[in-house]
Amino acid sequence: MIVFGLSGGAGSGKSTVAAMFAQSCNAAVFDADKIVHSMYSGDAIITGLVAKYFPDCICNGVVSRERLSKHFFSYGPLWLEFQSILHSIVLRQQRKFILEQGKIGRDYAVLDVPLLLEAGFWRCCDFVINVDVHKSLQWHRLRQRGLSEREIEFLLSLQMPRGSRRNFADFYVNCGGRKGEVLKSVLQIVGSLNAGRHRFRVARKKLAMRSALDRRASTMASA
């Protein structure tokens, strides 16, 4: 099974690309946001974790994502500690997902994970796909989610610069056009792998950037 990881800034279109892989190649998609949101709704371990760090975010036994988001944007020491634990839980879920999909004979799996590179989730991938759009479209999409200018700037500041993400990736998809164009890019990626190209590009590139990413992750955890 080939495992693709999607890197890209918030609002770049990673979920769209993941859906294209699922529709065109029957790829299994690991959607970290959906998994975390589901755990917020009823997972006892996650609810207990939130209650420990942010008791004001528990309403009738359920995590209030709206209240929790305020702690995220404050990005204090408590949030960083909480986030580190949450990432470790999601990483275990991701590894379990990959093993399960491999056992049933799936050909492709796609990891749609925020901070794929920054938090180290890319290590489970065979190939990284950089998904991007023009900055103006990205900001438009984020505004439509109800984020303020300040919140958008903060959110994007946590992510690697565009150039670094693209340099690290094995493939690139522009998600600013029509869906047909995005689908074409997805099929080209799969076709190039089936033709035997790109198979030996990933190791050298990942090794070259591993130390830089580890330093960034360490800085985020200790800030």
Swiss-Prot record:
Assigned keywords, A-Z: ATP-binding, Coenzyme A biosynthesis, Cytoplasm, Kinase, Nucleotide-binding, Transferase
The protein's Enzyme Commission number: 2.7.1.24
Binding sites annotated in the UniProt record for ATP: G11, S12, G13, K14, S15, T16
Reactions the enzyme catalyzes: 3'-dephospho-CoA + ATP = ADP + CoA + H(+)
Keyword Nucleotide-binding set for record: yes
Record localization: Cytoplasm
Class in the EC hierarchy, top level: transferase
NCBIfam families associated with the record: dephospho-CoA kinase (TIGR00152)
PANTHER family: BIFUNCTIONAL COENZYME A SYNTHASE-RELATED, DEPHOSPHO-COA KINASE-RELATED
Family, as annotated: Belongs to the CoaE family.
Annotated protein name in UniProt: Dephospho-CoA kinase
